[in-house]
C-alpha cells in the first residue's frame, strides 16, 4: 500500500474506536454540535483562560507543560524509548484558539485528506469552527490567522532520558491561508495521529461551550470534567486550579474555580457538592448533562467581571463547604406562568 494510503488509514482510525461491549468499530464524527477531542489534551490544560486586557495577555505568554504521563503510550514514544514528553508554545485561549482547534479536528474528519494535508474553503473552515459564516469579515480572517499561528507554534518534543536523541513536531505541522483561492490548508504529522486514537477519546458537546460565551474559566473546566469517566471520583480544588493554569494568588484562583463551577451549574450541565476533607477541598459531581437542561427565565444580568482578576484580595471568608441541597423536580412552565414568575422576581428586586 502507498504511503499516502497508510496516512489516510491512520486518519480514519484516528476518529474510530471499538465498542468494548459489542466489539463493533464505531466512527466518531464531529458536527456543529460536538467535536472529537483527545482526552489527554483536555486534561493537560492546553487551552486555558487568558485575560487579554492585561499587557501579558496581549503579548502572548509562553508556556511549557510536562505531558510524559499522558502521552507515553504513543507508539512513537514506545518505539523510540522516549520518556520525556513536553508541549511548549504560546498560551492558547478558550475563546479563539479552542474554536480554531475544533475547526481543525472537523476539517480532518469531514474533508478529503491528500497525503497528510486537507484543503477547504475559508468560509467552510469558519463554519466548522462554530462561527456564523456571516461574520467572515477581514477582522475575522485576521483573528483566525493569529489563532492558527499560535496553535502551529505549539510543539510536542520527545526525548530519551540519558540520551541526546529527540523528536520535535507540532500540533499542526503547517497552516496556510491562500488569499488568491480563499482556502485554508492544514498539514498534520502522521506520526502523532495516534494521539486521537487513544481509548480515552471523548465527544465534546459544543452546546455548553456556546452557552458559556466569554466565560473561559468555565469553558476550560467543562472540557476537563466532560473528559472524566462515568461517576468520577471527587475532584480536588487544587486539580481544577492546575487545569486553569492561572497566575493570580491562590485565594483568587480558588474564587475563580468556584465561580466557574457555579456557572456550569447555572447552565444545567452539572450539579455538585463542595466538601472539605482535612485541609483539602473537593467537588463531588452528582451528574453531567452535556446537552444541558431547558433554559430558565432570564434574571437581571450582573456586569461581567474578568475571570481571573476579582475585586479585592482579602477574600479569606470564602466558604469552603457548601451544604448539599436536595435536587428538586424539574417542570416545564407555560408562557403565562413564566411571565408571572418574572413579575414576582422584578417586584422582589425593587424591594
From Swiss-Prot:
InterPro entries tied to this protein: Initiator_Rep_WH1, WH-like_DNA-bd_sf
UniProt-listed GO biological process terms: DNA replication initiation; plasmid maintenance
Pfam families per UniProt: Rep3_N
Protein name in UniProt: Replication protein RepA
Positions with biased composition (Acidic residues): 304-315
Task of the protein: This protein is essential for plasmid replication; it is involved in copy control functions.
Native species: Salmonella typhi
Keyword terms, alphabetized: DNA replication, DNA-binding, Plasmid, Plasmid copy control
Region ranges (Disordered): 295-315
Residue spans crossing the bilayer: none
